[in-house]
Every structure is written in C-alpha cells, then in structure tokens.
Amino acid sequence: MTTTIQSPPWRVGVDVGGTFTDLVIADSEGRTDVFKVPSVPADPGEGVISALKTACAALDQPMARFLGDCQFFLHGSTVATNTLLEGKGAKVGLLTTKGFRDSLEARRGLRKDPWDHRTPYPPVLVPRYLRQPVTGRIAADGSEVEALNLDDVRAACKIFADDGVESIAVSLLNSFVNSAHEDAVAEVLREENICEWISVSSDIVPVMGEYERTSTTAVNAYVMPRVASYLTALQQKLIDMGLKTKLLMLQSNGGAASLDQLIRQPVNLLLSGPSAGVGAMQHLAAGIGENNLVSMEIGGTSCDVMLMHDGRVAITDSLSVNDYDLVTPSVDIHTVGAGGGTIAGIDAAGLMYAGPEGAGARPGPAAYGHGGTRPTVTDAHLVLGRMRPGPYAGGSVSLD
C-alpha cells in the first residue's frame, strides 16, 4: 500500500469503533491519508497498534521514528459507548441517601411517549440489593438535617465485598450544594478498599437533579474499570513504542482532554467517537455553502445522528444514550444501539429483533465470510442486494 503523505511532523487521529479502527494522518503540508483495520474487542488498543503498523508500512518508516515525529496524537473511542450499549460494564454498588435507593429505577416516572406502555426501559445498572441506603441528610440550602452514619457505609462495604462489586457509585441528596457527606463516604470507601474504582457524584456531576445526577454517576462507575484499563494500557504501549507527545482523548463535547482527567470521568467519553463528526460536518458545510445539514454515522454497534442549524451544532448538558439519562456536556447527538454489526434473530414469541448485542470485529457470517449462524444488519443488506459485494475502504475490507 502506498501513501501520499510525506513530511513530518505528523498529526494523528485514531478512532476505535466496535468493528473497525480508523487512523488518519496529516503531514506538515496538510496532506492526509486514512488507514482502516479490524478492531480487536478483547483489547481495543491492539486495533490502534495494528493501524499504526499499517501506516508505518505504507510510509516505510520504523514505528519508533514515526511516533517520535508525532506533533499530537488524538484518540476518539467508542469503548465507553459500547460498554454501555452492550451491557458489558462492571458490577456496580450504589450508596444513596436513606429513603431514596429506588430513585435510579423509578427514573422521572414519565414516559417519552404517553401512549406507549409496553416498551421497557433499559436494565437498571445497579440491582436493588446493591443499592444501599445511608442514614444522613443534607438540606437544599446545604445545611445538615441529619448526621451521617458511617456504620451504614461500612455495612454496605461488606455486602459489596461479599458480592464481588467492582466499582462503587456515591450519590447523596443535595450533595451538589454541600459535598461533606459524600466526601466522608468516599474516605471510608478508600479505607475499606473494596475496589479501586469509586465515582462520587459531587466530583463527577455536581448539579441539581437527583435522578439525573445518580444515573450519570452510576453510568460513570459502570464503564470506568473497562475504560480506565484500556486507556492506561494503550498510553503505556505508545510510550514504550516511542510516542513523546501526550495522548489526548476526544470528549463528548468535541474538546480534548488528557487521560489523567478522563480515567476518573469516563462518562465524558460516551460520545467521544461521533463528536469528531461535528468538525467534519462543519467543514463540509462551509465547502458546499450549506448551513443546515443532518449527519448520520452508522458504525458497527451504534447509529449517531446530529443536526446543524444555521451553521451551528447545539451543545447540550442533557444526554440520553440508549435511554440512560445523563447530565454531561456533549454535542447534541442522538444514539441508538443499532449498527451494521447488530445481531438479528427471532425471540421466543416468534418476533424478529435486532440488538443490542453486536458481532464486534467479526461482523457477518455472510458479508465477511466469517461463518456462524447469527446474521447481522450488514448480512441482511448484502443478501437483499442493497450493498454490492467487493472491496470497501480502499480495499482494506471486502464483502463476499
């Protein structure tokens, strides 16, 4: 494979999806090239390394020299998103104010469609027996109404330890005005050393709205171990291979941040991959003279839609990912767990379904010739003639 890029320093962007990993390199003259390889769901960092090896082969450069000449290295990842969509996160324990343990499951008590009484909500991330109440109360003005009982926290720790909890979320009433109780609970959790991963709502999302704050903190705890393990390992691999600049992560709001911040707040990465599309849409809009566009990005696991109106893409602090309600600054993207690699089937009632499980980096027993009996959306499009067999992505992948 040849490439048109020639002269360092390099600017590198890499996006890891559930199915493919895409690497974009820009050289000092602004020339760009794209490299696509299959992702490695068991270790997404291997997909990044594989894409880098492909690029280095095209450039005829040793890896260490290439990475050493990188001006910056920006990474967008759907690891957090796919962890949530596919239900493959950590076992989470939740500590909440006594009397409010069911807020996470009760949600707002409202349905988006008042006439739809049958569509279930997504599974609650923390089962009731792992939602443990803590005596103590902070009032809306920040004053202490009832003293905190740390013995409740220690009792909950025993339950969490016995059940193998991997990550703990703490969300107490009105902690966004006074975090003293949450700070004390977090200190006990660190002393008890049940697990490494602790998410405290007053650190993650110190805003009004008990349900949304609790939901956001629970999601953060749910995806944290997998995301942190991935990012830490990837950064160390890149450093060992010669990267001298910082690894930056693209956030849901379209900005970039270092790993130090995001390892503890991975909820800000839920739209890390698709938020990069905002820049592409704005660039395209300027080129064709259009200020109103709709962008739809269908990956292997999810589908992301965003709207540009009058040349601007909205930023929101209210986000819903697969019906999990979150409060985190993000590009106004709407995401559902349905992509090209989504597995379809027939349920016990004889009804057709698609998702939420995806085929990962081996999509399609028919489309990609990997064998198996579980068809995906891409298989259906190929069999129905909506997609043509043959090479795609510059010949890096081929549909049978």
Write out the residue ranges for each language-model feature.
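N-terminally biased helix-coil "hinge/interface" segments that flank
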Residues: 1-400
